[in-house]
Amino acid sequence: MQPEKIEHIYQSNLELFSQANVSYQQWQHEPILDFDADERIGKELGWTAAPTKSLFMKVKGGGHCLLLTHRDSRLNSKLVKQVLGKRVSVCTHEEMIEEIGCAPGAVCPFGLPADITLLVDPVVYSYQDLMFTPGKPDMTFAFAASDLDKLLQKLPNTVIPLPGE
């Protein structure tokens, strides 16, 4: 982990929600770095928002992208290749830390370098509320899924919605 990058991502998230005028809930808790801890802490804190997953991937031929999806969804690499025109592979923990500074299990979909393409799985729109880690593994944000597009429009990243399956 790179604490300065994580702090930057966290502050970028606070600014993003403010600029987009999107309400959110915030919790501080023990660090969540895997699905078991996520589920346990979620039950303890009474979370009802849908947990998201941010898969950080490298694109064949250069560059990176991130897939924002539901925690239980699986990567459809054929669909991603169809959309990007190139194959992708999930980055190793070391590559991810080097590129964006996030801890494995605490990758944030917002506040990333502008050259990272953000792919959005349409499944996330089927939930009332979404939650994610804003860079810091001991923090969780939740917001209305209906506000996702307001947030995405404020990002400097290229945002590509995946077609529904």
Where in this protein do the model-derived segments appear?
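Extended, low-hydrophobicity, polar/charged segments
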Residues: 1-165
